[in-house]
Amino acid sequence: MAEQKSSYGYEELLACGRGEMFGPGNAQLPLPPMLMIHRITEISETGGAFDKGYIRAEYDVRPDDWYFPCHFQGNPIMPGCLGLDGMWQLTGFFLGWLGEPGRGMALSTGEVKFKGMVRPHTKLLEYGIDFKRVMRGRLVLGTADGCLKADGELIYQATDLRVGLSKEGSAQ
């Protein structure tokens, strides 16, 4: 496993997407264009809203991002599910960063609220993920609350984001 750091740059996130960070058969991020994170600015096993750990990350929005021309023609908006997926990506990354084994999968979320939109003129998305618990059993399960800000304005909130890591189904 890679050295546990408190922040990660884009090239390191790409290495995670290639399966080079946490070892074979363990957590990895998707590669572009599905990677919804450009950098992790802070990650800690303690602190956050529930004092169970947190992760903060950013994504630079570009007017030519792949989703704008197709969602929707004449009214470009980033699909809300991509922001939600970014929250799940970070939740899974956190579990791998803790050294937990297995491949990640988004399992569920409690409540999701969309209060705003990401448009081509948006510059910066900021993710905040605060962990409520990490359960370690046959399946490692992380539960967290998340939020997404667009240029400093809160636009998405999600409660009880759940991501599991499982050794079953891992490609060997």
From Swiss-Prot:
Q: Which CDD domains match?
A: FabA
> Which GO terms of type biological process are on file?
unsaturated fatty acid biosynthetic process
User: Which reactions is this enzyme annotated as catalysing?
Assistant: a (3R)-hydroxyacyl-[ACP] = a (2E)-enoyl-[ACP] + H2O; (3R)-hydroxydecanoyl-[ACP] = (2E)-decenoyl-[ACP] + H2O; (2E)-decenoyl-[ACP] = (3Z)-decenoyl-[ACP]
**Keywords linked to the UniProt accession:** Cytoplasm, Fatty acid biosynthesis, Fatty acid metabolism, Isomerase, Lipid biosynthesis, Lipid metabolism, Lyase
Q: Mind listing the GO molecular function terms for this protein?
A: (3R)-hydroxyacyl-[acyl-carrier-protein] dehydratase activity; trans-2-decenoyl-acyl-carrier-protein isomerase activity
Q: Where in the cell is it found?
A: Cytoplasm
Domain of life, per the record? Answer: Bacteria
Recorded hits in InterPro entries, A to Z, give: FabA (IPR010083), FabA_FabZ (IPR013114), HotDog_dom_sf (IPR029069)
Q: Active site: which residues?
A: H71
Q: What is its EC number?
A: 4.2.1.59, 5.3.3.14
Q: In which pathway does it act?
A: Lipid metabolism; fatty acid biosynthesis
Q: Which GO terms describe its cellular component?
A: cytoplasm
Please describe what this protein does.
Necessary for the introduction of cis unsaturation into fatty acids. Catalyzes the dehydration of (3R)-3-hydroxydecanoyl-ACP to E-(2)-decenoyl-ACP and then its isomerization to Z-(3)-decenoyl-ACP. Can catalyze the dehydratase reaction for beta-hydroxyacyl-ACPs with saturated chain lengths up to 16:0, being most active on intermediate chain length.
Q: Which family is this sequence assigned to?
A: Belongs to the thioester dehydratase family. FabA subfamily.
Record note on quaternary structure: Homodimer.
Record's protein name: 3-hydroxydecanoyl-[acyl-carrier-protein] dehydratase
Q: Which gene encodes it?
A: fabA
